Amino acid sequence: MIIDLDTLDPANLPAEVAVSAVSMAELATGPHATNDVDERARRQDRLQRAEAAFDPLPFDSDSARAYGRVYASVAAAGREARGARAVDLLIAATACAAGLPLSTRNGTNFEALEGLVDIVVV
């Protein structure tokens, strides 16, 4: 959701927003994931604005423990829990450990987490 933050209707967002360090790491890859100079500049600008606006929630030992529960829930549902999906699950584990809802544009990425994380599709 953070990549779309400036295009979302503020009325659909919570009053307070937190960002995980894992989300910031994902955002940091953006400028390096394109060869288009203009797109790289847009992504770098987005990264710098996010870095200035947020003090990210760390992926700490509580998050690591929560990741085990998140992974088990997803795997038990027969969904992919490794590879590129693992990043989404690390973000979900951070929200789980912090007791915070996870707002996302891609609710299907977080299916099978009922009871662990409140997923809010915006």
Per-region residue spans from a language model:
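Alpha-helix capping/helix-boundary segments
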Residues: M1, S63, T108-N109
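Active-site neighborhoods of divalent-metal-dependent phosphate/nucleic-acid chemistry enzymes
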Residues: P31, D55-P101
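Acidic, PIN/NYN-like endoribonuclease modules and their adjacent C-terminal/linker elements
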Residues: A92-V122
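Short, well-structured N-terminal submotif of metal-dependent ribonuclease cores
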Residues: M1-Q48
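Generic detector of contiguous secondary-structure segments
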Residues: T7-D9, L47-D62
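Histidine- and aromatic-rich ligand-binding microenvironments
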Residues: S20, A84-R85, N106
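Short, hinge-like loop/turn segments at secondary-structure boundaries
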Residues: T34-D38, A75, V120-V122
